[in-house]
Amino acid sequence: MPSHITESRIHGGAYSSPEFAAIFSDANQVQKWLDVETALAATQAQMGLIPHEAAREIARVASVELLDLDALGREGLETGHILVPTLRALQGLCADGLGEYVHYGVTTQDILDTGLILQIRDAWGLVVQRLRGIRGHLLTLALRHKHTPMVARTHGQHALPTTFGYKVAVWVDEIDRHLERFEEAYARVMVGNLTGAVGTLAGLGPQGLEVQRRTLESLGLSAPLSSWHSARDRILEAAWLLVQASATLGRVANEIYHLQRTEIDEVREGRRAGQVGSSTMPHKQNPSTVDLISALSRLVRGQMVALTDAAFQMHERDGTTWRIEWAALPELFIYAGALLARMEGLLQAGLQVREARMRSNLDLLGGLILSERVMLALAPRCGKQTAHHLVHDIALQAQDAGVCFRDALLGDPRLRGCFSAQTLDDLLDPTAYTGLAAEMVDLVATKARPRASGDGAEAVMATQGNTSQSLYATEGM
């Protein structure tokens, strides 16, 4: 019976993603352990350390489908050990006593850590794929609206005109940096570890480094220079990349949320058939998807707090902190996977960009949004600081008197002869003061597109749990 929100049928899978849930499922985790054991045995056989028939037999039976996961869980509670039940089951499946060669010369954390890196690699490709999809949708939006004027807001207040396309291009540029980080970090993160009980490779003997190198190479991983049982920076880096990307997408969602506020109403989520905003207010159209994305972003970040605690390992290995990873890391990836899927789905369905409302909002302050432009036009006559003082004074008077900025400027005796009415009308045209916004959209669009390593997601196991989830939130208020 599901009790965690990532498995909840009531929430319609809103907090999870089938692909990421499959990667971090019990079945896939155990299969990764078996894959590592199989690769180790194959290498040891090639090097003459164990019989070839033992390696072949281990490979023949190393399938999670042959194991009873519930039984493994019960035995894990009895033994107090997470891997021993799997090792015993694998040994029992091997014929002719060849199971004696299972797990030869390594320790539990070798198998679990290397298996975890294999899971992270599977997820890595999906993350990059989703980010690229999101980037593509946003870039299309940025180019479409690179000349669409709107209010730029600083400290929550109207500041200057900008364009909606430029706002979106800033998001694209940020996502590109995340993709670059994923590319740069790939080689550092995709490193296994088969260094034995205390990291010295004593159990693998004089050929230990070669056994480790060959085994990890067969799994598509690099070998470490030293044990990382207690050095969790690779796990932290993988998690932190997701936290950063999730923070960006959470910020994008939060921006859409506020732009959809009734008083602003410049951007709306696409409306879906059957969507209900409120159980008691029939008119409501709540931003339910960006609601969820924003919440997921915070949940991803919350798991990072636990993972940093897991980095405080004592001595050569420490279960008191290592166990934190077992809970926090899968949740972080699953929440992030849900967030990425929801954002891509939102953009694929299309945002409603309300250009007329953007234009009318530019006029809400009666021209005051162009105060900088007026000040800079005055500066050659009287100096920038004096111009700032004059325009600031006139702007405050206009707001207090409730008159438009144009009339206040024309009526101020200090500015007599400075501007004709036509010149002032031109200066106060918000569509003509968006700076180089459109050009910068083109710069973002034409720069070299990041190529992130691991962008081809490896095949994941058949989706488990609720596979009928929507890409959108299903909850109203």
What is each model feature region?
Residues 2-195, 200-202, 207-212, 275-277, ...:
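A helix-coil-helix interface module used to build multimeric assemblies
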Residues 166, 236-244, 373-381:
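Short, well-ordered beta-strand elements within core beta-sheets of diverse protein domains
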Residues 178, 196, 228-322, 326:
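Glycine-rich anion/phosphate-binding loop at the beta-strand->alpha-helix junction
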Residues 210-229:
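A short, charged helix-loop
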Residues 292, 299-385:
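Long, amphipathic alpha-helical stalk/connector segments used for oligomerization, subunit docking
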Residues 349-418, 434, 439-446, 450-457:
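C-terminal alpha-helical interaction appendages
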